Curated annotation (Swiss-Prot):
Belongs to the MurCDEF family. This is UDP-N-acetylmuramoylalanine--D-glutamate ligase. It catalyses: UDP-N-acetyl-alpha-D-muramoyl-L-alanine + D-glutamate + ATP = UDP-N-acetyl-alpha-D-muramoyl-L-alanyl-D-glutamate + ADP + phosphate + H(+). It comes from the Bacteria. Gene3D superfamilies: Mur ligase, C-terminal domain, Mur-like, catalytic domain, NAD(P)-binding Rossmann-like Domain. Keywords: ATP-binding, Cell cycle, Cell division, Cell shape, Cell wall biogenesis/degradation, Cytoplasm, Ligase, Nucleotide-binding, Peptidoglycan synthesis. It is found in: Cytoplasm. Pfam families: Mur_ligase_C, Mur_ligase_M, MurD-like_N.
Length: 462
């Protein structure tokens, strides 16, 4: 019996373990952590015949035939390097799913920003057209969960991160989309060139490539990579990288794809030019899949957006509270500010990331009346604000204080919106950006239950 070891006890790791067990493998699953919840999962998986090792650091063994890596595990981990050097096949969970789901067609969507919204909208269009096309990867299902289902998908709509691409050596989607490219995850990938090449590799292996021509870096650096690629632009056909016959663009208020009018852009409910860019890419995918315009229009009209991305939470005393927790870098946070009407009270901070913050700082100067800083990056971001002589900021440390203080200051500064758009990772205070956004949501919704004086003066008695 072949033996596999899965690293990581999250949703992806558990799904990979169950998939291999179902297909006759001897399976062990490990995680460096231990907790009550993991121990409960351990009991269940042990009953299924899967060996679980908690509080365990992986080391390759000669008895292993396969090592599966969950998305959050660094690909250059010394133990994984030794595994590869000794000839043990070492792949990611997404690659494993691909091998079991080759009978389904795949859409692979990658990019620094925009991939979650594009993935969710694409899946919504396909499902409106009557196809079983679940979203998976970074959102929705773990990819291996789809391979475990009795009914296999017509299409797999996969949001694929750079981490997942580098651990997937044969993953070759029929259609691949590259949404944006900016400096991110450099602590993982070391330099911009390496990060770019990892993203590009997914498109190299795909049959149809769709790229966002409104992204400056892609426009300047990716045009020569793919000879028959398709390009989008919200700025019209004059801005297309490709010939107009391979373009998807806006013209006279319409989405035009491959020289055919598809839908009026006004059907899109989401705010911001970046969401129009996402729309064009999703429509392009739909047309290559043969979906009718009526289904595209119906799906776009009813698509509300994705949680934690410019998500409207509530209105308190005439001020809107907006959750943009998924803005984990400067470029995404700048896009969020561009999409909203000034004056804005901004909550930012978390775990700092490398990147160019010039556009983000420019948007703050133009649109923001006050900034509340949270997390380990608070002092660093305060210094960046001082550099542009923006002194309307306060370090409040945590989200609870930020929401209370934001509610109080919103009246003083006549802000239309209190916006959580961190421009930082979440791992200093939260498990992920979703948890951070949920905390913001609950605190914002709870404002109506606070004492008026506590909110009026931004009380920290909480």
């Amino acid at each position: 019996m072949s033996k596999a070891h899965i690293i990581g006890f999250g949703k992806s790791g558990v799904a990979a373990a169950r998939l291999l067990k179902k297909n006759g493998w001897e399976v062990e699953l490990s995680d460096r952590n231990t907790s009550d919840s993991l121990q409960q999962k351990e009991k269940q998986l042990t009953q299924e015949g899967i060996t679980v090792k908690l509080n365990y650091s992986f080391e390759p063994e000669t008895s292993l035939d396969l090592v599966i890596v969950s998305p959050g595990v660094p690909w250059d981990l010394p133990a994984l390097q030794r595994s590869r050097e000794t000839g043990i096949e070492t792949i990611g969970e997404m690659e494993l799913a691909w091998r079991y789901l080759k009978s389904s067609s795949w859409v692979g969507i990658t990019g620094t920003n925009g991939k979650t919204t594009t993935t969710a909208l694409t899946a919504a269009i396909f499902q409106t057209a009557g196809l079983y096309a679940p979203a998976c990867g970074n959102i929705g299902y773990a990819a291996c969960e789809l391979a475990l289902q009795d009914t296999l998908p017509d299409w797999v709509i996969a949001e694929i991160s750079s981490y997942q691409i580098e651990s997937s050596n044969t993953l070759s989607p029929q259609i691949a989309v590259w949404t944006t490219f900016t400096a991110d995850h450099l602590s993982r990938h070391y330099n911009l060139e390496n990060y770019f090449n990892i993203k590009a590799d997914l498109l190299n292996r795909s049959q149809i490539q769709i790229l966002n021509g409104d992204d400056y870096y892609l426009h300047e650096n990716a045009a020569h990579l793919y000879h028959n690629s398709y390009w989008t632009s919200i700025q019209g056909k004059a801005n297309l990288v490709a010939d107009v016959t391979r373009g998807i663009y806006l013209e006279d208020g319409w989405v035009v794809a491959l020289q055919e009018k598809i839908i009026p852009v006004e059907l899109l409910q989401m705010l911001g030019s970046h969401n129009q860019q996402n729309l064009l890419m999703a429509v392009a995918v739909a047309k290559f899949a043969g979906i009718e315009n009526e289904a595209i229009a119906e799906a776009v009209k009813n698509f509300p957006g994705v949680p934690h991305r410019l998500e409207y939470i509530c209105r308190w005393n005439g001020v809107d509270f907006i959750n943009d927790s998924k803005a984990t870098n400067y470029d995404a946070a700048a896009m969020g500010l561009k999409a909203l009407v000034a004056p804005i009270l901004l909550i930012a901070g978390g775990e700092a990331k490398e990147g160019n913050d010039n556009d983000w700082l420019r948007q703050i100067k133009e649109k923001v009346v006050f900034v509340l800083l949270i997390g380990s990056a608070a002092e660093f971001l305060a210094k960046r604000l001082q550099k542009i002589n923006f002194l309307n900021y306060e370090i409040v440390e945590n989200m609870e204080r930020a929401v209370i203080r934001g509610a109080a200051l919103s009246k003083k500064y006549d802000a239309k919106t209190v916006l959580l758009s961190p421009a930082c990772a979440s791992f200093d205070q939260y498990q992920n950006f979703e948890e951070r956004g949920e905390v913001f949501r609950q605190l914002s919704l709870g404002l109506n239950h606070k004492k008026k004086n506590d909110i009026r003066f931004g009380s920290s008695r909480i």
